[in-house]
Amino acid sequence: AAVDVGAAGVAVYDPVESVGEGSSAARIDERVSDLSFVVDRLEADAGGIDELRGRLDLGRIGVAGHSLGGIAAAEMCADARVDACLNIDGQQIGGPFSARRDPSPPTKPFLFLTKETRLHPALVEVFEAAGADAYRVVVPAATHGAFTDGSRYEPRLLPVDGTADHVLAIERGVVRAYFDRYLRDVTGPLLDGLPAPTDIYAEVYPLRGRPTLPAG
């Protein structure tokens, strides 16, 4: 996208795709293809691999990713073989949680784990139109990089408040509770009974009587 200031001094928005946007969209598409390929190969070969035989339930598949990988995970909601998607702080490239301009809202359980306390209206609309349970978990202390273990080693990725281990502990608790619920049918106090779509501000627990996340 770009903004052009015309002769009258009025800024006119031009929705043309920027170079960076096009490059990021291509990288997301590549990740989605890779994820789909992994599922293809597991379906075709898992039974013949000794280390995997009997260990995988391919009837229950969840996908999670961070940043562009999070958008790719959201895109995988469109794959009929995927049961739940989790996007960690990947917002939009072409459209909300997508490399495309006009994506469809997720029809599978969807969780967005983010540092953002406020979302663009287009992202909010995705939650309002979601065809299944949709959650937004906000960790205000986090930075984009704090959701990765790189924050333990690179000072520029540290959270704005608290410690790297603190944010990672929240992330682990949310990811586990979400996939426990939607892949293993194991309910717990973090998500059980909450209306969907809903917001969980992880830093202000307890919420509606729910307990705080574990420290580790």
Feature annotation, model-predicted:
Residues 1-18, 140:
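Active-site machinery of serine-nucleophile hydrolases
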Residues 12-58:
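Alpha/beta-hydrolase active-site loop
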Residues 31-38, 72, 171, 175:
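Stable alpha-helical elements in mature extracytoplasmic
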Residues 38-102:
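Primarily recognizes the serine-hydrolase "nucleophile elbow" in alpha/beta-hydrolase
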Residues 83-144:
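The feature captures the conserved acid-bearing segment of alpha/beta-hydrolase catalytic domains
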